[in-house]
């Protein structure tokens, strides 16, 4: 009998040590994600991957905390301490619904930022429906928002010589500024900014060895001049279906290629962000930063571009802020960042399925 008790006690001891090691590992990884935004991925790209895991690691630690509390284990302190700093960051991913916003006392500005995915979503998801139908649906939605400024990424047109006439037809009363990369067959893709405000200045920031870029436009509204950066930073360029096929076929080359693409993207993106940030620093007027960052709110990209700015979702959003449709609600990679002295009074991420991204719509009090 005594021997059985000793064996049982030994089993519990091993289980207790194993569970504490698991808690320490999960807590340690979560703590590293807090520092991921401070480390330039160009120098240590692995930190960026851990930043992507902030939400899953937070959930793992929460489950471990509840499990430890249920077992009346003193080890609950481990996940609890790891989770405490997350209270400062979780609002970047989800916001508790609040009462109606305080009415604006000053003039407002409405901005839409939307990665339209080259208008190819219908072709991928609904056979028989093409780019034209997808584009018409997207522009109908944008017109319904009645925005002052529209920032589009991955805009595509089949004839580069017809860009202005096409946009005039879709968005009457708006002036378009754009930079497009030509592709074989006469088509082109890139960034487009549309506005009905008086244009004061414009420019572009091209990134080395990349088909991504940022364009900027200066406007004046209600006696205030400001700049809008429309950014599309380096993407991972990976295919989830391709990864799954490689997994089922046990094809190691797929994973090797995916890893190379991720590393290339992660190391290029901070350089692009630094280029834009340098331009912002020299800008004589206050700046909005909009677009597809291809990075999460625990990233170096977000942390860098947030300096001197506020996040429209954090200030006025409700529910989950995720913008990448296929991994909802995990990935929030599209943003509208506004100058500190302005105020976001509305933020919306309509879940419309015209792209693999959802649009971001914000109303700003100037």
Q: Which residues are covered by each model-predicted region?
A:
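Structured beta-strand-rich core segments of catalytic domains in phosphoester-bond hydrolases
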Residues: 33, 80-108, 139, 149-241, ...
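Active-site beta-strand/loop signature of hydrolases that rely on acidic residues for catalysis
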Residues: 110-116, 134-163, 194, 217, ...
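Extracytoplasmic/periplasmic, Sec-exported soluble proteins
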Residues: 130, 134, 155, 182, ...
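Metal-dependent phosphoester-hydrolase catalytic domains
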Residues: 4, 15-30, 35-70, 74-80, ...
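Short, solvent-exposed loop/turn segments at secondary-structure junctions
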Residues: 116-119, 157, 197-200, 233-236, ...
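N-terminal, active-site-proximal structural segment of metallo-dependent hydrolase catalytic domains
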Residues: 2-166, 182-186, 273, 366
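Acidic/histidine-rich helix-loop elements
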Residues: 113-133, 237-265
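N-terminal post-signal-peptidase region of extra-cytosolic proteins
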Residues: 131-137, 176-179, 202-204, 212-214, ...
């Amino acid at each position: 009998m005594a021997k059985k008790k000793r064996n049982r006690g030994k089993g519990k001891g091993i289980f207790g040590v194993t569970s504490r090691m698991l808690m320490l590992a999960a807590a340690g990884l979560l703590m590293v994600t807090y520092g991921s935004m401070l480390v330039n991925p160009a120098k240590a790209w692995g930190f960026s991957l851990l930043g992507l895991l902030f939400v899953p690691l937070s959930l793992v630690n929460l489950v471990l905390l509840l499990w430890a509390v249920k077992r009346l284990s003193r080890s609950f302190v481990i996940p609890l301490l790891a989770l405490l700093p997350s209270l400062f960051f979780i609002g970047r991913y989800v916001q508790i619904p609040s009462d109606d916003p305080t009415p604006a006392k000053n003039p407002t500005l409405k901005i839409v930022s939307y990665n339209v995915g080259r208008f190819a979503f219908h072709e991928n998801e609904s056979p028989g429906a093409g780019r034209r139908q997808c584009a018409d649906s997207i522009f109908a939605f944008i017109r319904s928002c009645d925005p002052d400024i529209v920032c589009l990424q991955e805009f595509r047109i089949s004839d580069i010589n017809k860009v202005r006439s096409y946009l005039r037809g879709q968005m009457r009363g708006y002036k378009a500024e754009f930079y497009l990369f030509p592709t074989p067959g006469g088509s082109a893709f890139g960034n487009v900014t549309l506005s009905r405000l008086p244009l004061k200045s414009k420019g572009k920031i091209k990134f080395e060895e990349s088909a991504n870029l940022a364009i900027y436009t200066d406007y004046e509204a209600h006696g205030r001049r400001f700049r809008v950066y429309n950014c599309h930073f380096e993407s991972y360029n990976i295919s989830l279906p391709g990864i799954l096929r490689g997994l089922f076929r046990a094809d190691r080359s797929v994973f090797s290629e995916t890893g190379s693409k991720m590393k290339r993207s992660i190391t290029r993106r901070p350089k692009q962000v630094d280029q834009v940030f340098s331009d912002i620093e020299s800008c004589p007027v206050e700046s909005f930063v909009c677009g597809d960052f291809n990075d999460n709110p625990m990233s170096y990209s977000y942390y860098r571009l947030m300096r001197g700015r506020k996040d429209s979702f954090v200030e006025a959003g409700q529910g989950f802020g995720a913008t990448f449709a296929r991994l909802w609600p995990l990935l929030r990679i599209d943003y509208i960042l506004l100058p500190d002295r302005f105020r976001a009074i509305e933020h919306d991420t309509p879940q419309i399925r015209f792209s693999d991204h959802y649009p971001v719509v914000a109303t700003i009090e100037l």
